[in-house]
Amino acid sequence: MNFTEGCEATGRRPGSAGSRRRRAPRPGPVALLPLLLPLLLPPAAAVPLPAAADSSGEVGLEEEAGARRALLDCEPLARVLRDRAVQLQDEMCKKFTVCENSMEMLVRNNLNLPKVTEEDGCLLAGFDEEKCLTKLSSGLFAFQTYLEFIQETFDSEKQNVESLCYSTKHLAATIRQMVINPDEVVIPDSAAQKSLLANLKSDKDWIEKITMHLILRDFTSFMEKTVRAVRYLKKTRSFSA
């Protein structure tokens, strides 16, 4: 007897001959499973709704809260990265006498380091949020290889530079989350990173030291502009209460 026949048998009137003489076999656990699932699962899991169908606006509020947290986290982290870069520059000046006013700085200044320019929309006059955030995130991702070079070269500060690398990557990813079209953020592929890292290395120790100083100097400048841009965003971006 199949499951349908069992349901029909239990539907006979009590007291009829069929109900006294023939009892429907109890359906096994497998047969009951389709009936029990709606009772076992919470409503949201049983009938998932797309985010767009949420008329309560909770999804939008969650996205806003995430954007607010990301924005609030960016400024202090950017300040820390800027200050660490300044400290590393000071250490290089003390240990290697490679300082800002060294004449050797003119020897190698063709590193093509990321810079924030007027066209990037990060200046207070003509501030363009989407354009600026895209530039900042792309620039921070680009700095990864340069910082990795310092990590491999500046032995006495290897741990500090490693922390700088990790935090820079974290900030780049955080800012990327705030971009409307994150695909516009440029992230160097592994082949480009390996090629750049090889080009940064030199068999002359003093050239590598100058290279490190120039990287830290431009990274400090980039982070200073990042701090200003994020601070301005915090003042101007409006969130729902």
From Swiss-Prot:
Gene field: IL6
Which range is the signal sequence, renumbered to this chain?
A: 1-46
> Where in the chain are disulfide-linked cysteines found?
C122-C132
Q: Region entry Disordered: which residue ranges? A: 1-25
- Alphabetical keyword list: Acute phase, Cytokine, Disulfide bond, Growth factor, Secreted, Signal
Q: What does this protein do?
A: Cytokine with a wide variety of biological functions in immunity, tissue regeneration, and metabolism. Binds to IL6R, then the complex associates to the signaling subunit IL6ST/gp130 to trigger the intracellular IL6-signaling pathway. The interaction with the membrane-bound IL6R and IL6ST stimulates 'classic signaling', whereas the binding of IL6 and soluble IL6R to IL6ST stimulates 'trans-signaling'. Alternatively, 'cluster signaling' occurs when membrane-bound IL6:IL6R complexes on transmitter cells activate IL6ST receptors on neighboring receiver cells.
A Pfam family name for this chain?
IL6
Q: What is this protein called?
A: Interleukin-6
